[in-house]
Amino acid sequence: MRWYEISIKTTEEAEDAISNILYELGANGVVIEDNEIVTRPNLWDYIDENQFTKKDYARVCAYFPESSNILELTHTIEERLKETAKYIDIGEGKISVSEVNEKDWAEEWKKYYKPVEIGNIVIVPSWEDYKAEGNKTIVKLDPGMAFGTGTHESTILCLEAIQKYVKPGMDVLDVGTGSGILAIAAKKFLARRVLAVDIDEVAVKVAEENARLNGVEIEIKKNDLVEGIEEKFDVVVANIVADIIMRLSRDVKKVLKDDRIFISSGIIEDRLEDVLKSFEKNSLEIVEVKKLGTWCLVVSKKTV
């Protein structure tokens, strides 16, 4: 399978805002190259400092499926960059487009991706030899072409929430599972049953492989959000984007047990109020709102 790589030459100041735009537009993965990335906690940790050459600019690379309308997508990115430039210095803002093979991108991840600790969870690349210390829970991961490496702020927020809200014996539904990272973490924290769904066939395959890597039994299937799901769960988790979360808020109560938890993330800060209004409209009680960088997590519950 081939993918479009969209590369934007920008400033370190603007890289997070541009990453948010690209994720919103459906990027399956984003890689940031800048002069600070080596020292940032919870982000890429370089295997070899020789991989990194100091530059006076940053580059944000995003990967989109071959089926994308690349002309329309590029035009939309240009318009969003113009809007962003009104309040932040985006530098040159030059956009480059190329095609890459799935294998090439998968190998590129390995240059930057190393173990990441999030609470009691350690996300470990499948190719790394890593031994857990103390009571740490290891989640092995090969992200492939699916979103969810454990390094993105929205994923970190979700993993922290899973550690807080998922208890042994609970039933968990992961909507938009991506790499399967959240579903696997829930199972590692002794959830009784975990169902993981994604509309993307590539994500389903990647999640299945990651479940095998971790030796956990998870039901994984292609599905559009909660459509056709008749069971009810103690925890529903969705790390997607604001618009889809608002759509999901209309139906999530159908798959939640009474007084149980909906963990939602992937919400950029300027869309938080829209999401909260949607939850209020659909009678979801807000339990917790948490922010990390420009990303937000909302925990709500189904009231009786």
UniProtKB/Swiss-Prot annotation:
EC supergroup of this enzyme: transferase
The protein, known as: Ribosomal protein L11 methyltransferase
A GO CC annotation given for this chain: cytoplasm
Database matches in PANTHER family: ELECTRON TRANSFER FLAVOPROTEIN BETA SUBUNIT LYSINE METHYLTRANSFERASE
EC number: 2.1.1.-
Gene: prmA
NCBIfam families: prmA
Catalysis performed (reactions): L-lysyl-[protein] + 3 S-adenosyl-L-methionine = N(6),N(6),N(6)-trimethyl-L-lysyl-[protein] + 3 S-adenosyl-L-homocysteine + 3 H(+)
A molecular function GO annotation: protein-lysine N-methyltransferase activity
